[in-house]
């Protein structure tokens, strides 16, 4: 199968002015989104925020960041070209904004971490595949963990109180191998399944990557990951012999290892470095380079992959002009030298500050040390001196009175990191590249300026982009999505469910407005639609509007396609709880439990809550299911798994009071909280919103 994938870049924005607030920055993101419309033709997104562009891409504001999602591409050269087109588009939009108003220029950054607020953003990746998501996740994990030797953005450890270089700062924010959340409790693999296509197409979504500036780093990130996914789809097992005993621990270990020599433990009991893991994966790709399931550019990718690993093995510092983290490390060392410091001295200060914090609060050291700048405040400084800060520093060859100089150095390094990825002429990477001191370019990237306004030719982005260009003059009559363009006035829609569709096929309108939704759910209604995700949302709409028959037909059709089997059976169980059909509730809960092996942790937890409820309603002992739930929650350690909401939400009128009271009591006993207040903002159908103890 031909590869198909895309990338998202999250841009940090700082509004004009001496002290812009978060609200100012959010307003700037919205204004910049409007300015993009004046740079390239655009249509409003049909379901959700943002706009789709004439190059097939999407731009939108999410969590105070302006995001640009590339159109679907088929090779790493296109991936780099359209990622750079996003940068170019933002730069042009800023110029457009300045020319049309008296406001000062806002600043846009391709960054990944806010060290002061300990927040992260970066770059998401989406890949088309056909294997089961759980299989892909397991087989891809060793590659994702070890690829940061060439995909790391470089920066600093956000949890260190001083200054500690990190190959990949964002990696240190990943807490789980898998997670359904992208805002809190992040996982290396994002488990939310949103295909955005029809048939057997599945979409792998990764949130562990970083925004990059080096063409070589960007190219390698996409090329190598596509090859590993192709091998998995082809029936190979890239993780054979490389499964990690602790994927998150290994990810963090490699992220803190600029020498590329740290060994991590494998499930087999053996140990391996990131470079050794990468070489074994590369060898498998080389051995199957001519297989029909591999892209036709596999050999070219393997040559560049091997050359990069060889370079890192000889001396990681040799990447000081080619890879993001190598370039940054060399740049930071120049800043250190200008301040009369070096990595060893910075490490001594970091160690001293850790000891100072521990001495100041021996009864309960903070999980995350406060910013060392707070030690410059008089009260904190006095406490530190009383705790023996001077002695702590002397033992490390430091002088406590020099702390202000170290804090100033830290600020300078953080500013350097931020400015590295700034768009426009103020960016340090742009400055270095313009000076000709870097060697990061990749041959064959092509015309970036053309990619700002024109889509790729070999995917459905071609049809989408062409439609946007032709229809943008009538923005109130048309809306767009990844898998459709909708004409409300003409009652037609452009079907883009086929990822490689390159010809426009307008069809009669069947989904999208209330009348059409009702019509689609009637017996004999046409089955064509916008894909299984849309049918799931349509079923939700029917359920919330009391159309239980329509919801049932849609959900049963999803089961016939094996779409999210455990989750869909759970939806049907909840529907029949509402209608009072106990026998069907039992059936679908049992079916959901049988399909649990392929389900995310939060779906398994929901199924267990339903098992407990069924046992309670049937006057049976629910304790075995309660014990299973407790064990599952302890193992999954995923806050979204705590939601009892499918059992409670909108069911208070259909549950007998004793059963409801028992469930509430049980929930408080397990979760230690009041579930009702946490369920108000939780969307049971999609699993998004607030769960106990977490926000998303």
List each model region and its residues.
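Start-of-helix register in tetratricopeptide repeats
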Residues: 533, 567, 604-606
């Amino acid at each position: 199968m031909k590869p198909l994938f895309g990338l998202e870049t999250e841009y940090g924005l700082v509004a004009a002015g001496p002290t812009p607030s978060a609200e100012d920055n959010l307003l700037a993101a919205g204004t910049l989104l409007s300015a993009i419309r004046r740079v390239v033709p655009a249509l409003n997104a049909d379901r959700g925020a943002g706009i789709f562009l004439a190059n097939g891409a999407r731009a939108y504001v999410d969590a105070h960041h302006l995001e640009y999602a590339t159109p679907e591409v088929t090779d790493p050269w296109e991936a780099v070209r359209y990622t750079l087109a996003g940068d170019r588009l933002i730069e042009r939009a800023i110029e457009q904004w300045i020319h049309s108003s008296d406001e000062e220029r806002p600043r846009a950054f391709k960054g990944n971490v806010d060290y002061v607020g300990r927040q992260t953003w970066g770059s998401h990746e989406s890949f088309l595949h056909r294997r089961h998501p759980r299989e892909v996740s397991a087989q891809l994990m060793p590659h994702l963990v070890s690829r940061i030797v060439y995909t790391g953005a470089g920066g600093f450890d956000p949890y260190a109180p001083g200054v500690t270089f990190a190959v990949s700062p964002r990696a240190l924010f990943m807490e789980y191998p898998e997670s359904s959340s992208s805002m809190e409790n992040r996982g290396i693999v994002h488990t939310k399944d949103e295909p955005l296509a029809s048939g057997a197409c599945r979409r792998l979504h990764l949130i562990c990557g970083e925004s990059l500036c080096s063409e070589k780093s960007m190219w390698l990130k996409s090329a190598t990951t596509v090859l590993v996914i192709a091998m998995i789809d082809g029936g190979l097992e890239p993780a054979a012999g490389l499964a990690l005993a602790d994927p998150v621990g290994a990810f963090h270990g490699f992220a803190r290892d600029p020498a590329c020599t740290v060994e991590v433990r494998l499930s087999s009991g053996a140990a391996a470095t990131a470079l050794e893991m990468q070489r074994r994966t590369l060898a498998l790709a080389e051995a199957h380079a001519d297989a029909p399931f591999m892209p036709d550019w596999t050999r070219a990718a393997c040559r560049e992959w091997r050359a990069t690993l060889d370079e890192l093995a000889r001396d990681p510092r040799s990447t000081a002009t080619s890879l993001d983290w190598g370039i940054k490390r060399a740049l930071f060392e120049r800043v250190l030298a200008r301040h009369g410091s070096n990595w060893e001295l910075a490490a001594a200060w970091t160690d001293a500050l850790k000891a100072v914090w521990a001495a100041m609060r021996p009864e309960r050291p903070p999980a995350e040390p406060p910013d060392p700048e707070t030690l410059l405040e008089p009260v904190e400084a006095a406490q530190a001196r009383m705790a023996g800060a001077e002695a702590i520093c002397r033992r490390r060859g430091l002088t406590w009175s020099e702390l202000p100089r170290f804090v100033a150095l830290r600020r300078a390094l953080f500013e350097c990191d931020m400015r590295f990825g700034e768009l426009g002429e103020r960016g340090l990477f742009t400055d270095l590249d313009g000076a000709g001191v870097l060697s990061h370019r990749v041959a064959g990237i092509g015309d970036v300026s053309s990619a700002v306004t024109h889509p790729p030719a070999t995917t459905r982005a071609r049809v989408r982009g062409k439609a946007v260009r032709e229809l943008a003059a009538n923005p109130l009559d048309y809306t767009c999505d990844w898998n459709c363009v909708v004409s409300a006035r003409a009652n037609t829609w452009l079907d883009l469910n086929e990822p490689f569709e390159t010809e426009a096929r307008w069809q009669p309108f069947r989904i999208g407005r209330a009348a059409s939704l009702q019509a689609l759910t009637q017996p004999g209604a046409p089955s064509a639609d916008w894909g299984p995700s849309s049918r799931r949302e349509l079923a939700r709409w029917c359920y919330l509007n009391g159309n239980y028959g329509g919801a049932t037909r849609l959900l049963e059709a999803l089961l016939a396609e094996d779409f999210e089997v455990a989750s869909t059976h759970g939806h049907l169980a909840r529907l029949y709880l509402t209608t009072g059909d106990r026998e069907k509730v039992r059936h679908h809960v049992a079916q959901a439990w049988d399909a649990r092996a392929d389900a995310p942790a939060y779906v398994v937890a929901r199924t267990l809550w339903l098992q407990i409820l069924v046992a309670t309603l049937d006057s049976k002992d629910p304790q075995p299911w309660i014990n299973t739930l407790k064990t599952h929650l302890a193992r999954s350690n995923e806050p979204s798994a705590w939601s009892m909401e499918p059992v409670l939400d909108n069911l208070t009128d259909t549950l007998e009071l004793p059963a409801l009271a028992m469930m509430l009591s049980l929930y408080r006993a397990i979760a230690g909280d009041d579930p009702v207040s946490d369920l108000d903002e939780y969307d049971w159908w999609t699993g998004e919103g607030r769960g106990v103890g977490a926000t998303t």
